[in-house]
Amino acid sequence: MLLKAASTFSLLNIHGEKKDISPLFSSSSSISSPVSSGKSGNLSFPLRASKSSTTTTSTLSGVVFEPFEEVKKEMDLVPSGQQLSLARHLYSPECEAAVNEQINVEYNVSYVYHALYAYFDRDNVALKGLAKFFKESSVEEREHAELLMEYQNKRGGRVKLQPMVLPQSEFDHPEKGDALYAMELALSLEKLVNEKLLNLHSVASKNDDVQLADFIESVFLNEQVEAIKKISEYVSQLRRLGKGHGTWHFDQELLGAAA
């Protein structure tokens, strides 16, 4: 028994009745045309389309950014009291306290360097190169403290200055001499500052404060490494020279380099 494939038009009965054949022509995107039946034999059939894509108002990710809705929760974070910082945002109390501690470290080191400057500037010591070096070092450490204070205010923290330790006023050493002893003391202080800065950086990392971590990295850490290297070289040179006439020549070289 042979089966013949029926043509599309055979789906219409002989009496001209229309049957729904749209499933044969449905697509994800086409135009719609009505069925018209005029004279016998001139038939047309519908081409129906359905657009399945969403409107273009939604983004490709399906997430619509609504700024006025999302900012509502941020508005609740803006304090209304006059004594509260408006700029503070994602700044933990632990980071704030660590910055204040570093400010105190910088001021204390600056104070020691200022005492060293005063010592070498005496008329009975008269090592002007060392005096100038330690005076500049004192100013540099004070500027570091001021940078930290400025950053504290930027983040909405409160600067709380702490007491400073009274530095010694005599730096002569019976074996090493005053120049070598003072430079070794300076090297120890710079390494201490470096440790404190690394500790501050770890506090920032622990609290996921990338802004504070970036500030410490970009402003302080590389400069601290350079300072340690420079003072290490000065210590090595003074150890070679001893306490004699070579100290004066070292001081003159330092005075010329600092000028």
Swiss-Prot record:
It is found in: Plastid, Chloroplast. Fe cation 2 binds at residues 141, 190, 224. It holds the Pfam family Ferritin. InterPro entries: Ferritin, Ferritin-like, Ferritin-like_diiron, Ferritin-like_SF, Ferritin_CS, Ferritin_DPS_dom. CDD domains: Euk_Ferritin. Belongs to the ferritin family. Oligomer of 24 subunits. There are two types of subunits: L (light) chain and H (heavy) chain. The major chain can be light or heavy, depending on the species and tissue type. The functional molecule forms a roughly spherical shell with a diameter of 12 nm and contains a central cavity into which the insoluble mineral iron core is deposited. This is Ferritin-3, chloroplastic.
